[in-house]
């Protein structure tokens, strides 16, 4: 389906050269998110001559495109706005790859586990938000999310460090000798969401396996503050930890625990949620009593790269989800989001249009900081639209109105089977029925403030 970006832009409401936010007024939140979403789509190349459907302009990589579509799925949900549905659907389906598992040929030489995971998280959100279902049931949102999970868990590497996912999928890519929190945290996160949606406890088993490995190797540290470190080199049995902390890693683990507590009601997942939330304070700067989000490992040194400039987007999204799934967290998270949204609104005053969003939200009285990009737009959109998270239903499940059809064996295509199968039980259902199958396959296979 071809869908004109110019038509999309024309459907956005008109705006003046400023963003004014009243966090208690749904109309201003909607209008501001409308403006910011339009700015986000200015970076989209998929409807332009020579562009690739689903991809944003250089220098934004494939994984960040998956993150951006996840943001726009929530945008359509929070504001009950179906304007972007055809555009988002085309993007999500075009990039699935021949085996419908988000390993497309155009990314086969560079794709990492974390890259694939962010597309999986996007389609998982589509299932949970009852986003318009694809006409082809074999490409249902839940099925695609299961395909990503299945192909990721098949790469679980017990030959080094007693488990864990490598950062990279393919041996020729730099980072194949690194096991990082974003890849493993995303597997944990997807497992938690699939467990809650399908009711299949085999996903809980996988979530626990990933959690225990990350804890055992030292990527998760249990102290007064619960740190989530960036990753480990496989040399010396993964004993050399890279002690950077990134907000999106904290968010992946936090929301994953929240999903598991909401589903299992096990006290340990509640306790982990609270501890991770307490330690998330490191990603907020106290500005005269306002707690404003920032990327602590790179913003103070003005060294955030294009990827890192989008991390606050996913962190905001995962905070919003946590506040819904574990209501006890709502007061703290709401204050953080409100304070940060005010800061973000102050930063969205740059560019030739007067509404381009910047990176820094902590100096909003100074306005735009001169930085711009897909990550800046996405982050501002997410922190503002998550002010609406309690105005709309919680993420749906197969038992509470979710209509996406699942396939527990999705994603393997023609691959041979020799991996430990995922147990399928009667609870693994989606939409109209239960699909049972045996899964089996294998694939080839970043301080409290900065660094401790």
UniProtKB/Swiss-Prot annotation:
A Gene Ontology BP annotation from the UniProt entry: fungal-type cell wall biogenesis
Cell compartment(s), UniProt: Cell membrane
Lipidated positions per record (GPI-anchor amidated glycine): 431
InterPro entries named among the record's database cross-references: 6-hairpin_glycosidase_sf, Glyco_hydro_76, Mannan-1_6-alpha_mannosidase
Enzyme category, top tier: hydrolase
EC number(s) on file: 3.2.1.101
GO cellular component, one term: plasma membrane
Stated induction or repression of this protein's expression: Induced by HAP43 and up-regulated in absence of CYR1.
Family: Belongs to the glycosyl hydrolase 76 family.
Its biological purpose: Probable mannosidase required for normal synthesis of the cell wall.
Protein name: Mannan endo-1,6-alpha-mannosidase DCW1
Protein source organism: Candida albicans (strain SC5314 / ATCC MYA-2876) (Yeast)
């Amino acid at each position: 389906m071809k869908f004109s970006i110019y038509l999309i832009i024309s459907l956005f409401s008109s705006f003046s050269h400023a963003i004014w936010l009243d966090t208690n007024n749904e109309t201003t939140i909607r209008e501001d998110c409308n403006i910011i979403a339009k700015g986000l789509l200015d970076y989209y190349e998929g409807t332009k001559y020579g562009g690739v459907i689903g991809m944003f302009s250089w220098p934004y990589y494939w994984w960040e495109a998956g993150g951006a579509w996840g943001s726009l799925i929530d945008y359509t949900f929070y504001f009950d706005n179906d304007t972007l549905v055809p555009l988002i659907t085309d993007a999500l389906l075009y990039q699935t790859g021949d085996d419908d598992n988000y390993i497309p040929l155009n990314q086969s030489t560079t794709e990492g586990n974390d890259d694939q995971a962010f597309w999986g998280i996007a389609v998982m959100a589509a299932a949970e938000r009852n986003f318009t279902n694809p006409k082809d049931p074999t490409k249902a949102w839940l099925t695609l999310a299961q395909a990503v999970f299945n192909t990721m868990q098949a790469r679980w590497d017990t030959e080094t460090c007693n488990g864990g996912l490598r950062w990279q999928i393919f041996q020729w890519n730099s980072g194949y000798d690194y096991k990082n929190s974003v890849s493993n945290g995303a597997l944990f996160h997807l497992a938690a969401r699939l467990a809650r949606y399908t009711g299949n406890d085999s996903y809980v088993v996988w979530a626990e396996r990933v959690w225990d490995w990350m804890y055992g190797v030292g990527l998760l540290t249990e102290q007064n503050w619960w740190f989530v470190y960036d990753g480990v080199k496989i040399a010396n049995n993964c004993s050399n930890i890279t002690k950077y902390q990134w907000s999106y890693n904290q968010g992946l683990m936090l929301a994953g625990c929240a999903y598991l507590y909401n589903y299992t009601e096990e006290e340990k997942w509640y306790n982990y949620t609270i501890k991770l939330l307490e330690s998330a304070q490191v990603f907020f700067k106290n500005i005269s009593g306002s707690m404003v989000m920032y990327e602590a490992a790179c913003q103070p040194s003005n060294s955030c790269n294009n990827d890192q400039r989008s991390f606050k987007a996913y962190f905001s999204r995962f905070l919003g989800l946590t506040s819904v799934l574990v209501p006890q967290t709502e007061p703290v998270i709401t204050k953080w989001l409100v304070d940060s949204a005010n800061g973000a609104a102050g930063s969205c005053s740059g560019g030739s249009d007067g509404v381009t969003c910047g990176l820094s939200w902590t100096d909003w009285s100074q306005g735009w900081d001169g930085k711009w990009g897909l990550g800046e737009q996405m982050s501002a959109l997410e922190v503002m639209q998550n002010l609406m998270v309690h105005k709309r239903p919680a993420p749906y499940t197969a038992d509470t109105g979710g209509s996406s059809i699942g396939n527990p064996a999705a994603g393997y295509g023609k691959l041979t089977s020799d991996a430990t199968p995922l147990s399928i039980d009667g609870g693994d259902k989606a939409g109209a029925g239960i699909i049972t199958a045996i899964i089996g396959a294998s694939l080839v296979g970043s301080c409290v403030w900065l660094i401790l």
